[in-house]
């Protein structure tokens, strides 16, 4: 089994203006992997560039991959996968996931997952809170469709997922 070392900016030199790069070099000598929850995604990228161990994005303003993985695993747990093995790469292939809510970090990550795993996302966001496709980083609009009406976005969906309607 493993152990967890939980550090906040108050528990480390990160809160005392030590460069992220230096913290990455030191911390990664003591652990097998690092998970970071922070606001700016660039902080994770900088840490990872100087780390000796894998770095997991626990949450940033731009992305929330751990939550999307948890949602996908919950889908597999309740609905199974196409081949009955629980294979992550096939579980949503050809399916439709409806996203209703703010075009935030979770919406961005659902779009990335759709492109990687071969499903379609139906997006319904409030006006002024749309997904910024340059942040989401999707290469093609083939993996998503945008709907003004949330009910239309959810019609025929295999999975409906949501978050706040508008972030504060």
Give the location of each predicted region.
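Glycine-rich phosphate/diphosphate-binding loop of Rossmann-like nucleotide-binding domains
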Residues: 1, 78-162
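Tryptophan-centric aromatic hotspots in well-structured domains and transmembrane helices
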Residues: 54, 99, 165-166
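Phosphate/diphosphate ligand-binding glycine-rich loop within oxidoreductases
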Residues: 1-76
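Short glycine-rich anion-binding loops that position phosphate/pyrophosphate groups of nucleotides
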Residues: 40-41, 164-168
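Surface-exposed loop/turn and secondary-structure junction residues enriched for glycine/proline
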Residues: 15-17, 23, 71-72, 109, ...
